[in-house]
Swiss-Prot record:
Keyword Manganese annotated: no
Domain of life of the organism encoding this protein: Eukaryota
Native source organism of the sequence: Ampulloclitocybe clavipes (Club foot)
GO cellular component: membrane
Function: Cytochrome P450 monooxygenase; part of the gene cluster that mediates the biosynthesis of clavilactone A, a meroterpenoid that features a unique benzo-fused ten-membered carbocyclic ring unit with an alpha,beta-epoxy-gamma-lactone moiety, forming an intriguing 10/5/3 tricyclic nested skeleton. Cytochrome P450 monooxygenases claO, claP, claQ, claU, and claW are close orthologs, suggesting that a redundant function or pseudogenes are present in the cla cluster. These monoxygenases are not involved in clavilactone A biosynthesis nor its modification.
The protein, known as: Cytochrome P450 monooxygenase claP
Topological relation to the membrane, as annotated: Multi-pass membrane protein
Major localisation: membrane
Stored Pfam families: p450
Amino acid sequence: MTPVSEIGTLDVLIFLVFLWLLSKLVGRLVRRGRTTPLRGPANKSLFFGLTRYLNEADDPGAIYESWAAEYGPAFRVPSVLGSHRIMICDAKAIAHFYSRETFGYVQTSLARSAIKNLFGRGLIWSEGESHKRQRKALSPAFSNAAIRRLTSVFFDSSYKMKAAWDSILESNPNNSVIDVQKWMNHISLDSIGIAGFSHDFGSLDGKHSDVAAVFDSFGTSKPSYFSMVIFLLAQVFPILLKLPTNRNLLTNKLRKTMSEIADVLLDRTRKEKEGKMGIVEEKSIIGLLIKAESAETELRMSQEEILAQMNVLLLAGYETTSISLTWALIELSKKPEKQAKLREELLSQFTSTDPTWEQLTSGLPYLDSVVHEVLRLHPPLGETSRVAAEDDIMPLSTPLVTRSGQTVSSIAIGKGTVVGVPIRCMNRSEVLWGKDAKEFIPERWLEPGFGENNEIQGHRHLLTFVDGPRTCLGKGFAIAEFKAALSVLIRSYTFEFPGPNGAVPKIERHRSILPRPKVEGQDGAKVPLRVRRVE
């Protein structure tokens, strides 16, 4: 018999790994026993499951939709290292899922690790009562009254970009091709800087900004194969996100840069408030964060939470609106007749003035239709995944047939099961939106009774801003900024693709922080369009 003292460290590690793998296997078998045995696509890889296949697809939403048609509105998808996810494409099931978020369904280990690494322990990282507390503290900054006050900021940034473009067109009238995505990034960053933190990053003026430089590097770099493999395996081993891959190092640099800027802005605002060097608007985003830091109530936030909120706002303000604006210009360049129709609506009312917040909200129906059609077709976030914190019974609006051949109108979800909602798939579903669901048709939003039979309960029947307790807090802010910027762009310029006769190129997905559009053949996430002034 081998003495205990002779057992090597490697032997102990191997034994511990064996025990860990055994516990994972037992846990997986227990979860499967508590979960309805659903049908689903066959596995393509013992190592990656179907995760790599979906990650590399140009349109994962279309793949999910085809699986829903074949296997029913809830199905089982093979994932990394033999694990599985349940994907739900049923309106009633999705409503149930979102209503129980932060308590019944929580962030996956991968999501929490990624969010913590990038932002810190803020609103989108938190769960349960902590999430409820932080959301309540921030809500006043995104009220209608607050957004109404910020509308002028959105227009100011738009006109700064217009001045820069006019200068470009005057200096080089024979070459009016502009990479619009780069400029949408700048307008979004400057707007969130001024509106949220009373700080002008100056990216529209050509000033160097460390945070803009790091953001832009995600648009020019392509994840290596090794980075991709590590990210996929991190779904089972989240600690792999700490490995020094090129993408993880870039993420760490982004977090460091955002935190440094957030620290400076927060310290400056504290001094302004304490020394009365300036007026800190209590209901501005940074004003509310300062208030929450010193609060003696349940709404108090720690220094770490405050910096995390600022990181989230910086990144969300940069990424989501810039992506949506870029997609809007792409779609309107594809359909010049719809671009002209939008321009006619805007110029018929506003030639020398700008719309008020009220007019942006409800006085420009075609602008509203264009914006929501872009948000429907091109949600910045393609899907969400959560893990069941407890056993659950999920109702279905459409019955399905299980692997055993049984027809059921609800499914059991075992504790620990990963459940996903394919947002892009649901936004483009022919079952919900009709046979032309994949087409850009703003007019659908103007049809009498449109959406009355749509069972999706998200904003305007869309899942773009998700739903339930985690509904995007800044959706009103994002839509107002989107509308203000687009109204200035379309009143001022015409847009078309620069190829022969405006030929439409292939639009691909660039894997940035969030997926971005890019024109095929371009180096990085570039979308060059021919821009001409409206005479």
